Amino acid sequence: HAGQDEVRPGQLIMAELDGVLGNDITTPVAIREFEKAGFDNVADADRINIVLDHFVPNKDIKAAQQSAACRKFAKTHDIPNFFDVGKMGIEHALLPEQGIVTAGDCIIGADSHTCT
């Protein structure tokens, strides 16, 4: 994924990604930055994975607004790997369980446990 024979700790690389992962807490932040940057379209909707797994069912109005922002973004950009209430699970387990992530894939995600 790095296009190199070897990488070392601390080295910065430009990795070829198989996908990205966001959840109901981090995706709204990414959406705001996406919009601030002036983007109209996502590069590859098939590589975007959004899982509502932290505050669903929603615990309060803020959580409901965050979920709504994710739903709107997924619908606007035809993101097929959007996992809403009733179709979601723990994001780190869900992607491998659904066959979206397989051995050797390189996925980045906006969550503290993404290394799983």
Locate the predicted segments by residue.
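Fe-S-dependent hydro-lyases/dehydratases of central metabolism
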Residues: H1-T116
